[in-house]
Structure formats: structure tokens, C-alpha cells
């Protein structure tokens, strides 16, 4: 039985007393197999749950670092984070940094579009920092040595203004939320797998904020000169009028979703990526009145035509290249 963060694992083994086979917990001790006592099993389960809590803390910490770096931004962003269950180890030195830099400057971030989205790669504390540019709408990713990674992507949408040209409401279509999620997951998973040599399961989360000040980590920051947070909704567009068609009058400044994922499934950009994206997108969009996204099913079936006008063609092209338009 290989090691995993889900241990201890029970196996069918001969009973120590005259009876049928029972479930027992093995442990490798040198070249021999040892059987765990009840105390050993209890300790192992405690270690499992402690490790899960530490991953949650790790996820929150690296996301907070990213939000702190972008704290001045006042427009809607999607923040996606992936933390492997078994940490990897990306070595950072001069020779390897040159290689990482070349890889990342040519990497494809936006699915269905040519590579080369990023313009700058730099070194931070135990991480690589990758940015599109210096603008307030540019993407920023932080790729950590242990394989954990997070990225913030500005959301495309509409800005509704009053007579004085002051923003009163930001809206985005479901496709403008799901597409950047679909792009971020394989990019982050590829870092964990290919640079840090992490593998297996990971914890993935997605956070949608109307304004970086709406992120939970920023609630303790008081800035009297900062403008108020502009309300945000996810609205479909009425094809007849071209105007937003809200499902709910409520606006939420902050929404989150989380799921367990397989790194290989995400990095390989196959059906597993669609299934993971569907689980996250459905949970995220429920905050805005949608039972499910309607764009990707939990089985991994994709509906490119349901995406927004600016993303549907790109999604269809990418899906065709990867054989994901075939019915299941």
C-alpha cells in the first residue's frame, strides 16, 4: 500500500484469532509489515485531520499574500488557488530560474488563445511571481516552492454608471466567470506537477470578489480614503434586448467554492478538468442565484454556446483541439 495523506489504510488480512479475515492496518517497518495497534490507528487518524487543517491554513495564507499585493484594486476579480496534499519541492537557483522564466513567458494561460500571456517573471520569498503587466487589470500569479499556487484574474463584464459617470453596479455573465476558472486550474496544476514534482490529490478553491477590499482577509484594513465597494452581480444577457437579466436582486461582494481535485486531471486538460471546473463553478454561482452554471455538467460535458459572446468561440476551439466536444 503506497503512502498517501489519506492513511491509515485498512486491508483484509488473516485474523490473529480463529475467525474469518478481518480489516487490519499495516505499516512498513524496514523489510517487514507491522500491524498498527488501536492507539497507533487513533494517532494516524489524528495526523490525517491535522494535515487537512494545515492545508486549509496554507491555502488561506497564500491567497491572502496575493490579495495583499493587489489590495489597491477596486474591480471584480476571480482568485483561484491550488494546494497539493503531498507538497513538492521546486528548487530555485540561477540556472533553473532562467528555465522557469522561459517556460512561463511562453506558457498558455488563456485556453484557446496563443501562449505568451505573461510579461514578467520574478523571484519572491520561496516563490515565483508572474505578471501580465503593470496595469490594474493584469493577471498575477504566485507559484510557491511546495507546489502551491494562486492566481488573480480580472473579470470582464459591464460597468453601469449614473448620470455623473460614477460606477453603480458591475455585472458579468456566467461564462465570463467560468472561462477564467477553466484557464487557471490547468496553469496552477501544471506548476505543482511539472516544477515542484507534486502529484496526486490537491485542494482547489475559487474566490470571487467585487473589490479586493471585499476579500475576508482585508476586513481588518481600514482606509477612509478608499471608495465604497461597487455592488456586483452575475447576470445573463437577454438576447432580445441585450440587457442584463438578473436572477436575483441581491449582490454579493464575496463568494467562494472549494473541491478536491487530481493534479494530473487538471494539468492534462481533459474531461477531469471539466468535471473539477463544474464542481467549483456550480458552488460559486449559487451565491448569485444559479443552481448550476449551465455551461459544464458534473459529468464533464461542455456547452461552448452557453458562454459569453467574447469567450464562446475560444472555448469551442480549445475543446475541439482536446476532443472534448464528443458526447459521453
Residue ranges and their predicted role:
Residues 1-18:
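Divalent-cation
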Residues 14-34:
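Segments surrounding the PLD/"HKD" phosphodiesterase catalytic module and close analogs
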Amino acid at each position: 500500500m503506497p503512502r498517501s495523506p489519506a492513511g491509515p489504510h485498512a486491508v483484509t488480512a488473516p485474523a490473529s484469532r480463529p475467525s474469518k479475515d478481518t480489516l487490519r492496518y499495516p505499516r512498513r517497518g524496514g523489510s517487514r509489515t507491522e500491524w498498527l495497534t488501536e492507539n497507533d490507528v487513533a494517532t494516524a487518524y489524528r495526523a490525517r485531520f491535522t494535515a487537512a487543517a494545515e492545508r486549509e491554513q496554507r491555502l488561506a495564507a497564500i491567497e491572502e499574500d496575493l490579495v495583499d499585493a493587489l489590495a489597491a484594486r477596486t474591480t471584480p476579480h476571480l482568485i483561484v488557488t491550488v494546494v497539493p496534499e503531498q507538497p513538492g519541492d521546486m528548487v530555485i537557483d540561477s540556472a533553473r530560474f532562467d528555465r522557469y522564466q522561459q517556460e512561463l513567458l511562453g506558457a498558455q494561460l488563456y485556453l484557446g488563445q496563443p501562449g505568451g500571456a505573461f510579461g514578467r517573471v520574478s523571484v519572491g520569498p520561496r516563490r515565483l511571481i508572474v505578471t501580465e503587466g503593470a496595469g490594474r487589470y493584469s493577471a498575477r500569479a504566485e507559484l510557491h516552492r511546495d507546489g502551491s499556487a494562486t492566481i488573480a484574474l480580472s473579470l470582464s463584464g459591464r460597468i453601469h454608471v449614473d448620470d455623473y459617470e460614477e460606477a453603480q453596479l458591475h455585472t458579468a455573465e456566467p461564462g465570463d466567470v467560468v472561462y477564467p476558472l477553466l484557464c487557471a486550474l490547468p496553469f496552477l496544476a501544471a506548476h505543482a506537477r511539472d516544477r515542484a514534482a507534486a502529484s496526486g490529490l490537491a485542494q482547489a478553491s475559487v474566490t470571487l470578489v467585487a473589490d479586493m477590499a471585499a476579500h475576508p482577509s482585508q476586513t481588518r484594513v481600514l482606509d477612509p480614503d478608499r471608495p465604497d465597494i461597487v455592488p456586483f452581480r452575475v447576470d445573463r444577457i437577454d438576447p432580445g434586448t441585450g440587457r442584463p437579466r438578473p436572477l436575483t436582486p441581491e449582490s454579493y461582494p464575496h463568494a467562494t467554492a472549494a473541491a478536491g481535485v487530481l493534479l494530473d486531471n487538471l494539468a492534462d486538460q481533459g474531461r477531469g478538468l471539466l468535471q473539477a471546473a463544474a464542481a467549483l463553478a456550480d458552488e460559486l454561482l449559487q451565491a448569485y442565484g444559479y443552481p448550476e452554471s449551465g455551461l459544464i455538467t458534473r459529468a464533464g460535458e461542455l456547452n461552448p454556446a452557453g458562454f459569453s459572446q467574447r469567450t464562446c468561440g475560444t472555448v469551442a476551439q480549445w475543446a475541439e483541439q482536446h476532443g472534448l466536444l464528443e458526447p459521453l
